[in-house]
Amino acid sequence: MKKALIAMSGGVDSSVAAKLMLDAGYDCMGATMKLFDSDDILMAQREKTCCSLSDVEDARSVARRLGMPYQVFNFKGDFKEKVIDKFIATYEAGGTPNPCIDCNKCLKFDTLCRRAITLGYDYVVTGHYARIDCVDGRYRLRKALDDKKDQSYVLYNLSQEQLAHTLFPLGELHKDQVRAIAEENGFINAHKRESQDICFVPDGDYAAFIESYTGRHYPPGDFVDTQGHVLGRHKGIIRYTIGQRRGLGLALPAPLYVCKKDPESNTVTLCPNDQLNSTVVRVTEFNWLSIAAPAEPLHAAVKIRYNMHQAPCTVEVLPGGDVQLTFDTPQRAVTPGQAAVIYDGDTVLGGGRIV
């Protein structure tokens, strides 16, 4: 009998994933990753995080109801080093990170997967909405059947070895079906609200989290236009992201948007909306997942942020391994630090970090 370790967040998706794996005949154990102490999170946010006591108890309740063992694993050190510290460093360098991608690669499908294998489990199972198949000996990551819930974008950075030890039982289901299964089985979290924010910054105030967590102060500096003329003062470079208009605190004759952040000069550059468009973007740390790196340029589709439609582009591998994307139609507010993930239909070809 194959054995599966279920990564349980306390939410409905991972709970139903556990139920489906048991129904499929797997020997299962539930596990929740403890990623940070609540003392590390602002007081007002503690009970909103995925590592709150209530979430652990929800996961434990479902595991008990399903009659499977359950453990909590302490991965705080790895999470701090590989996710939180990188999140902060990216903001300080002027980028806008996506820590969920790093958590998936480094924690769920690395640290947790290695723990699972050590304990004798064959697979790690999560409640992600995505699919995996294998063609000619190569694993492919594919979009979920439910396009509105698809999470393949945040999974592009997995390796072939990680895909080989991963199962996504929700990939063929829609969210309403998942909630119905939870309700039929009396799960305590059947109607639990989904988290839409970064787990360790659930209120979305990234700057406040960074200042509280590091104890550092990020000084004010100048807003400038594209010619370098000073337009006013900003409140610290970590408080802004590319494409932002609201919250600038400036009285301007026409709308301006953040188009560049320069940590060295501590300036934030503003421009009109029509100057936010990009035709070409460079992507680094590229992970070719479902195919090997192509020798010739190829035409594909790309997502440059989580909640966007795919945009057609030409993909070219550069000397050294970086990738250049040339959009068929200019794209607005391409943001350094975010992921660019390329698709062929519903298959994830690969992705990397925008520079």
Question: Where is each model-derived feature located?
Answer:
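ATP-dependent adenylation/nucleotidyltransferase module used to activate substrates
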Residues: M1-Y156, L167, D176-Q177
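AMP-forming adenylation/ATP pyrophosphatase catalytic core
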Residues: V125-I132, G137-V355
